[in-house]
Amino acid sequence: FKFDAGIEPKNSVQLIEKTDRELVKEMITLDKFIDVLIPRGGKGLKKFIIENATIPVIETGAGVCHIFVDESADIEMALPIIENAKTQRPSTCNSIETVLVHRKIAEKILPELTEMLLKDKVELRYSEEAFGIVKNTDFTHKENLKLATEEDFGAEYLDMIMSLKLVDNVEEAIEYINEHGTHHSDSIITQNIDNAEKFLNEVDSAAVYLNASTRFSDGGEFG
């Protein structure tokens, strides 16, 4: 049978295997054949399509996601959550780009966190204060430990790159995320229920998590 639109079910989903930019440029001008585009990919691809398409475009947002490690965080819990959120599939928009660490536990967590992520071959870009805590430690792949610039905070890397900075409290973390994030997915690692509730209520993101990875923001997990 056929639907009213005359489309056979077996042909309702089709795959274009070529991915070169010239083909994309041609396709996004076929307004006689394509009704709407929903681009998925990196910032460069989305910008290219928005600037060149003659077809209506539904723009999808970037994913600058954060994890805040609070003063009361269980460090043994925090480490694998951060590792999962950054390294499992870094090219996705629900992977984290920045970790915020409460200043009072920085000296306790940073050496172990840094060693873990450097072993995973993540390039780390630390704020000056955070960098100062670990700069004299002999890490594996220490060449990937670098000082961050202002451009790193708010950047969507979609790669094995992560920035990190220290904050004084949950209020500062919330303010930073709301200013530098893209309102996608953000998480707090804490044992303090008041700080957890404040973070979950005041971070203006589509998904906020307590003691969990931002990688849960996906169709399969949401059913």
Please name every model-derived segment.
Residues V99-V101, D159-D168, H183-I188:
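Short, well-ordered beta-strand elements within core beta-sheets of diverse protein domains
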Residues N169-V170, I193:
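Catalytic core of tubulin tyrosine ligase-like
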Residues L37, H102, A173:
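Residue-level signal for inorganic ion chemistry
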Residues E112, E175-G223:
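C-terminal core of ALDH-fold dehydrogenases
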Residues L15-K18, L145-A148, L164-D168:
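Short acidic-hydrophobic, aromatic-tinged amphipathic segments that line or gate anion-handling sites
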Residues D35, E97, A206:
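Conserved acidic residues
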